[in-house]
């Protein structure tokens, strides 16, 4: 999954060429009415080639009509090729995933505790299996016993094994992954054919892909333009009769194909599929094309501080006692409150305490773990208790117990916060001893990324459980626009609703069960693959690498998808207008000499003018395939700036390029006439 696929790999091109011919079947082509019009024109040209008197008025040579047939055929093949190539890349990724679904046996645990070996395909929801070192997990499940490291690289591309154990947020395992060490007992949670891997394959292959609202709106516009141009073409026949100008049916067919928006009509499906593919190349699964497209409309990002903006492993940097306590007493209490704390922060406090060369206590007590509600952790001994935690929570505890708050505590807490650190207050028996300074490190490159997002009109909001000062310092250092301090997971849904009430499109990341409501509420929810099943079901995007920073990448991909579609649509419509004014003067100058003044290109003849435009129309589809597949490149700028730039490049370019291309092709045709 993590490996990217080159656009024009030989095996993909060969398969795409075969598929592009198979897609000529009319039942398939009618799904794209614009290209179906081209196919009808191609069949009429073929009929006129075989039976020149089909309409009792054909005035051009059979070779000329056959040339039109061949060019129209190539136009259809090129349009189908772009779609087939985009689909082929998805199928290649799906085949890579399918390789992990090799036939395997499963060790099912029967009710009497004995084992039986059965085919993994025979496993049902609720069955319990035992998986040991080196064995593959046969299907999606939930760990009910044991602790093991699991290698998920076959699914996620991430080489580092992850720890799975019963209980908590990390007890879900994916079928197709393998146990790297120890053993697990797993309760199967999905029926055969409905596993996470099966869903991934379906998503990657695009089997469930439907047109997005923007695609439907654009398609409606293109169909309207097609009908308008067809009506214009139909009126030309009686007009030519009135002017005593013999306008052949073959030329009318060619002119119709030149003027309707075949360029974007042939590339529209490929653009959407390629957009999904670019997301997949980042190891992100999109549940629908709509979710990727919505990313392009996002203007507010809700970001967690820990793990997204900072590296997440805050390290103890200093012990700062209050005036009424001593340094040694603070170190001992901090050590005792952290000795059983297995978090990175807890381990760093113990490590820093050892460096102080103080005789540390060895008394054993009952560990009180940190919770989102209490926001503190510590140890209860027989005659006393020590805690460390968020300043507000600790002060509240002391006040409720009738204790004394040191006068210099507030200054110490603010001092740590102003440095961008996180202060933890330490107390013993409701007596505050001092502050632990936890250092937070901003991830590299985020300042520039946030600046780029700001220039594009995207606002970043940092949500953190830290106090106001710490949050403000980190927000300023990272360059986020706003922050929400002392924010609990359940508070995020309120932040999202507030932004949506302002008319904003909101995106957020999450991995826990408590994030699921907010992920479902957000317009774009990116769940971590390492997270809970409820979070992954609530989100519309899943990051297989479990890297929350990727939310920013997905938003940029979504914007690129919309820009690519808009840019190529602008280019296509500008092309049609340019071809209209390039061809018509050359066609009618014999019947209407005044039209010769408009024939600024001085094309050789009406026949060569139409043929040149038709060839250009086919070639431009091929030339635009790389842009449709890779997307339009852009740098951070406001929407208005990007729009003006694209109008200049693709609008003006779309007007100029046809004049140049058609003239060059006309000159080449003259060499063979």
Swiss-Prot record:
It holds the Pfam family E1-E2_ATPase. One of its GO terms (cellular component) is plasma membrane. Mg(2+) binds at residues 511, 515. ATP binds at residues 341, 345, 370-377, 388. GO terms for molecular function: ATP binding; ATP hydrolysis activity; magnesium ion binding; P-type potassium transmembrane transporter activity. It is found in: Cell membrane; Membrane raft. It catalyses: K(+)(out) + ATP + H2O = K(+)(in) + ADP + phosphate + H(+). The active site is at residue 304. Its EC number is 7.2.2.6. Keywords: ATP-binding, Cell membrane, Ion transport, Magnesium, Membrane, Metal-binding, Nucleotide-binding, Phosphoprotein, Potassium, Potassium transport, Translocase, Transmembrane, Transmembrane helix, Transport. The chain crosses the membrane at residues 34-54, 65-85, 216-236, 253-273, 581-601, 609-629, 649-669. It is a multi-pass membrane protein. Its main location: membrane. Belongs to the cation transport ATPase (P-type) (TC 3.A.3) family. Type IA subfamily. The system is composed of three essential subunits: KdpA, KdpB and KdpC. Part of the high-affinity ATP-driven potassium transport (or Kdp) system, which catalyzes the hydrolysis of ATP coupled with the electrogenic transport of potassium into the cytoplasm. This subunit is responsible for energy coupling to the transport system and for the release of the potassium ions to the cytoplasm. This is Potassium-transporting ATPase ATP-binding subunit 1. It comes from Staphylococcus aureus (strain N315).
